[in-house]
């Protein structure tokens, strides 16, 4: 039994080795590093414009200052487990063309290998790729690059890139929910289910 488990573990390590050898987990975007204190990036962020995130009180959003590569963007920082620490970085490239998107996608493919997921729509109005990693502390990290054609009211047109440490986001959510438990719901009388709800 031990030999079988050891063999399976060894086989999994061999399969994971090419992806791990290709590149380290990305942690920096637009000059900002995931997990760092946002206040240490006063030259890159507009700290005075920090705002709460709708439906996520465990996070706050701080705008990214435009530079020669990015026209806009933001970082999400924690409010509970690690207050002020950067958990997500999202930036919109100044060049919104499809050619630029293809060039960036090619560079990401050469650096990080094949994406783990396609992040687009079949009609081609939204195209994108997602890479998934595990950071040195075994927290999941994702990198998403997308191109949007036309004027989508939710995303806007152009090219965006987003780097997220899901472990940091989840730690913030769990901390906030532990400190702010949901009120207990009162059980009321159950109505007729008309036979379509299992009991």
Tell me the role of every PLM-derived stretch.
Residues 7-17:
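Bacterial N-terminal signal peptides
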Residues 22-63, 91-199:
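Non-cytosolic coordination micro-motifs
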């Amino acid at each position: 039994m031990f030999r079988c488990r050891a063999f399976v573990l060894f086989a999994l390590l061999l399969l994971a080795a090419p992806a791990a050898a290709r590149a380290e987990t990305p942690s920096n975007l637009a000059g900002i590093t995931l997990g760092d204190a946002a206040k240490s990036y006063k030259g890159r962020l507009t700290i005075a414009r920090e705002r709460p995130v709708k439906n996520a009180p465990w996070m706050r959003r701080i705008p990214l200052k435009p530079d020669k590569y990015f026209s806009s963007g933001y970082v999400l920082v924690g409010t509970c487990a690690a207050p002020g620490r950067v958990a997500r970085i999202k930036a919109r490239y100044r060049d919104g063309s499809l050619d630029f998107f293809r060039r960036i996608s090619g560079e990401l493919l050469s650096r990080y290998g094949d994406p783990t997921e396609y992040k687009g729509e079949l009609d081609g109005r939204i195209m994108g790729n997602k890479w998934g990693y595990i950071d040195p502390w075994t927290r999941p990290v994702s990198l998403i690059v997308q191109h949007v054609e036309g004027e989508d009211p939710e995303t806007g047109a152009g090219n965006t890139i987003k780097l997220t440490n899901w472990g940091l986001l989840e730690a913030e959510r769990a901390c906030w929910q532990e400190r702010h438990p949901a009120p207990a719901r009162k059980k009321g009388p159950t109505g007729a289910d008309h036979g379509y709800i299992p009991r």
